[in-house]
Regions:
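Short, polar/charged alpha-helical segment
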Residues: 37-59
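Short helix-initiation/N-cap motifs at beta->coil->alpha
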Residues: 60-71, 158-186
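Pocket-flanking alpha-helical
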Residues: 66-97, 112, 119, 142, ...
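Alpha-to-beta junction loops
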Residues: 74-84, 128, 151, 172-174, ...
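Ligand-binding "clamshell"
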Residues: 91-103, 118, 190, 195, ...
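A conserved helix-loop-strand patch within extracytoplasmic ligand-binding domains
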Residues: 103-153, 251
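A bilobed periplasmic-binding-protein/Venus flytrap-type ligand-binding module shared by bacterial periplasmic
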Residues: 110-121, 223-235
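Periplasmic-binding protein-like
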Residues: 138-147, 245-265
Length: 266
């Protein structure tokens, strides 16, 4: 009986260990992604069930600014982030020494000009005030938009990170107010024109197609990307995220929900 009792105890231990291993195999791995709320947080929540089916529990960590998601990624607080275009990422890597990289482009958020005072950029009065993002990538993008509209002319060689100091010709003597990208929509009551990133426009109920007075060219190089730490580009979790975000389901959602405010590039 003593031998049989010892055998039964060992059998129970082995059974428990086997069940523990099986349960561990069935437990989904956590996939943490940093994002801005609209549209990125919404799109991520849309694909959560698809990632669950691939064995990942998606956790979305939302930020209201453009800096924190990259800091969190570099500090290994999240697995990936999804909120920024490639020029912004490149500038962050260069200026902050971050060890992060782009994995895949997902969509374009057309930048646009909005106003409560005029109906067209042609109606800008002399000395008009224009608010633009204060980071180099998005501020430069806003100035390039104004140049494409014929409102200003930039110096030769001034590219994606142009600043108001790079303006060569400003016939209407426009005055520029530089604020954090997330705060630009809040300046609409105080300026003649605000140049707003679409994610922040959508967040306050503005649609780039319906509500703007000038829209960025459709050939924009500013595709929003999934980013990860250097060396993690082939991480199965990161690849699963890219697969989920580039599905027909997501493309249909972007087109039908945002009506031109979010343009898929896959």
């Amino acid at each position: 009986r003593t031998f049989q009792g010892a055998f039964d105890v060992k059998k129970q231990i082995l059974t428990a260990a086997l069940l523990s291993l099986l349960t561990a195999g069935l437990t989904a791995a956590e996939l943490t992604v940093a994002a801005t709320p609209v549209p990125h947080g919404d799109i991520l929540r849309l694909v959560a069930p698809d990632l669950k089916a691939q064995g990942y529990d998606l956790k979305v960590v939302e930020f209201s600014d453009f800096v924190s998601p990259n800091i969190a990624l570099d500090a290994k607080e999240v697995t990936a982030n999804y909120y920024q275009h490639k020029p912004f990422l490149d500038d962050a890597v260069k200026s902050r020494g971050l060890k992060i990289a782009s994995v895949a482009p997902i969509h374009i958020l057309p930048m646009a000009a909005y106003s409560k005072r005029i109906k067209s950029l042609n109606d800008l009065p002399k000395g008009a005030r224009i608010s633009i993002p204060n980071d180099p990538a998005n501020g430069g993008r806003a100035l390039l938009l104004l140049q494409s509209a014929g409102v200003i002319k930039l110096k030769d060689g001034a590219g994606a990170t142009a600043t108001p100091l790079d303006i060569a010709d400003n016939p209407k003597r426009l005055r520029f107010t530089e604020v954090e990208a997330a705060q630009v929509p809040r300046t609409l009551d105080d300026v003649d024109v605000a140049i707003v990133n679409s994610n922040y426009a959508l967040g306050v109920g503005l649609n780039p197609i319906k509500d703007s007075i000038y829209l960025e060219n459709k050939d924009s190089p500013y595709a929003v990307v999934v980013a990860c730490r250097l060396g993690d580009e082939q991480n199965p979790a990161v690849q699963a995220l890219v697969k989920a975000l580039t599905s027909p389901k997501v493309k249909d959602y972007m087109i039908n929900t945002y009506k031109g405010g979010v343009v898929p590039v896959f």
